[in-house]
A protein has these predicted regions:
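Membrane-integral, polyisoprenol-dependent glycosyltransferases
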Residues: 3, 11, 23-384, 568-571
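Membrane-embedded architecture of ER/inner-membrane glycosylation machinery
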Residues: 204-206, 210, 324-579
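N-terminal start and proteolytic maturation junction detector
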Residues: 13-15
């Protein structure tokens, strides 16, 4: 049974102890003691220092944000949308290679275009735009830390962020140029608004409204739908949320949300009612009735199968804490997190398409709840420590071995079996900067694990350091190989010499990532046969062929063809048509 002893005191206004302190005089009317926000989460002897946490954060965040071209598939088309806004300042209609792209609202693209303009003199355009991802991840981590502090006390936020870094499925997507990072940040802000609202309903409602707006302007109705379903379900889950104060809290959130999203909606409607309808009906509701076809068709129990590894170790830690806390009663703050997870899980599972990156928001409540498991030092903590140390010694050693093979080509048998066959044409590359960064991270994180008492005694700290070090090694020693296998520059840059001047080029079956990068590398915007009637007046045709199917007949002369290294699916052919 859920403990509702203190239900009558939910959503009181109390003394601010976090970043909301500056708004205290404006919003507070009365205050009571809020123990969790002021009491320490752990004894000083078991608490990881803020400096060490920041060092791990830097080691985890920076590698992967720069040093490579836009990768297929998500980064490629996202970069095309960002460049359009940077060049035209048109934030109303996201445009990809000359065509409106109404799948997502423009928040991430606008922010990334700002970073592109700001940093492109120092960084390449893709790297400069990718800084937006780092920006949103920093915001998300800060909001997660504040939520954990509200729930468990001072210092809990550090452990929640460390748990997030340890989640196996998170690092890759958290460093990519994708709108889901902005959605993730909005979800973290929204959750903090819910939890803060329990003791400060006005400011909490305002923060919830901001989080919902960020989610809406990142990926449409999906994010606010999860927050809205959470808000509607909470009164059913806990009597603490059946009060006038909670109604005021929700009303404030709605009043803050509307002015932030209406300007873009109104501008889009005024620009084109047809585009507005496409965005609303196809790219939002179409996710659930199957008409959008925005991703792979959802398989049965997709997220049931995904989360055990994707959210490890947050999922088992959160489940363990909930099981231990159920007998004594789960607080209203914890019930917010449980409800958000259930609402998100049901919403995502009911969609017609599914991808692992869609599960990113589900990590938010799990990592915050999992922080509670760090409070209790049990027999399992002692038993898991040797296993964590073993992983820390084993996995980075394997990564270093793989990195040496990629840098030197030695030993030859392993190179020929694993590298030469998987990426034909790739040559060993040694970067002194990347090698130095990998070595420095290895020494730093190894010293953290073996020399710092708090980290040495915590299996979670050891495992997080292990995942972080493996990520650093992959993004330094393995970056040349990964970039070689995922970029399109090796295909489209040679194509430039064969393209006609001052003549239109039609295209067939050309995907969104390919269209975006053709414009970036070659300055070419094709006329798609599937979209433009004028394409049939062009004398040139660029075909994207799926090698798993027979080639289509083209009445013309093959002028050029190319493909990405070791790509078993895509092949590109340029024809001069017989017209």
């Amino acid at each position: 049974m859920v403990n509702t002893k203190n239900c009558q005191s939910v959503f009181p206004v109390t003394r601010a102890t976090g970043p909301e302190r500056f708004l205290l005089r404006k919003f507070a009317s009365k205050s009571t003691t809020h123990a969790n926000a002021t009491l320490p989460f752990l004894p000083a002897s078991r608490q990881i220092s803020l400096v060490l946490c920041v060092l791990v954060f830097i080691c985890w965040l920076l590698p992967g944000l720069s040093g490579h071209e836009p990768w297929k598939p998500d980064e490629a088309y996202t970069f095309g949308l960002i460049r359009h806004i940077a060049q035209t300042s048109d934030w109303v209609v996201p445009t990809l290679a000359g065509e409106p792209f109404m799948e997502k609202p423009p928040l991430y693209f606008v922010v990334a275009s700002f970073f592109l303009r700001l940093f492109s003199p120092l960084l390449g355009e893709p790297d400069a735009a990718r800084m937006a991802t780092g920006f949103f991840i920093v915001i998300a981590c800060y909001a997660i830390a504040l939520s954990a502090r509200e729930l468990f006390g001072k210092g809990a936020g550090r452990w929640a962020v460390l748990i997030l870094f340890a989640c196996i499925g998170f690092p890759v997507r958290a460093h990519q140029m994708i709108t889901d990072t902005a959605l993730f940040a909005g979800g973290a802000i929204g959750i903090y608004g819910f939890i803060l609202g329990i003791r400060h309903h006005v400011l909490g409602g305002a923060i919830l409204g901001i989080g919902a707006a960020v989610m809406f302007l990142s990926k449409g109705l999906l994010g606010p739908g999860i927050l809205g379903l959470t808000a509607l379900t909470l009164p059913l889950m806990n009597t603490a949320f059946r009060s006038r104060r909670y109604i005021v809290f929700c009303a404030i959130a709605f009043l803050v949300f509307c002015p932030l999203v209406v300007p873009w909606l109104y501008a889009l409607w005024m620009r084109s009612e047809k585009l507005f309808s496409t965005w609303l009906l196809v790219n939002n509701f179409g996710r659930f009735d199957g008409t959008a076809k925005l991703g792979p068709k959802a398989k049965h129990f997709f997220y049931f199968k995904l989360l055990p590894w994707y959210a490890f170790p947050a999922l088992p830690m959160a489940a363990w804490w909930l099981w231990r806390s159920w007998k004594t009663g789960i607080s209203a703050s914890a019930m917010v997190l449980v409800t958000f997870f259930l609402a998100g899980f049901v919403t995502l599972s009911s969609a017609s398409d599914a991808r692992e990156l869609y599960a990113m928001p589900l990590l938010l409540p799990l990592v915050i709840l999992a922080a509670g498991a760090c409070q209790q030092k049990t027999l399992w903590t002692i038993k898991l420590r040797p296993w964590a140390l073993g992983l820390f010694c084993l996995l980075p050693t394997v990564m270093w071995g793989a990195g040496i093979i990629l840098m030197t080509g030695w030993p030859a048998p392993l190179w020929n079996k694993w590298v030469a066959q998987g990426a034909p044409g790739f040559t060993p590359q040694i970067s002194s900067v990347m090698f130095a960064a990998a070595l420095l991270a290895t020494l730093l994180l190894s010293g953290l694990v073996f020399l710092n008492r708090t980290c040495r005694e915590s299996p979670l700290s050891i495992f997080t350091s292990c995942i972080t070090l493996c990520w650093v090694l992959a993004m330094t020693l393995g970056m040349p190989y990964l970039d070689y296998t995922k970029r399109y520059s090796d295909v489209f840059l040679p194509l430039r010499a064969w393209l006609p001047k001052d003549e239109c080029v039609a295209s067939r079956h050309l995907g969104e990532p390919q269209r975006a990068l053709l414009e970036y590398y070659d300055g070419l915007i094709t006329l798609r046969e599937e979209k433009h009637r004028g394409a049939y007046r062009c004398n040139w045709l660029l075909v994207q062929h799926d090698k798993r199917h027979p080639e289509e007949f083209v009445d013309g002369t093959l002028v050029w063809q190319g493909e990405r290294p070791a790509d078993n699916e895509e092949n590109y052919q340029l024809y001069r048509l017989n017209r």
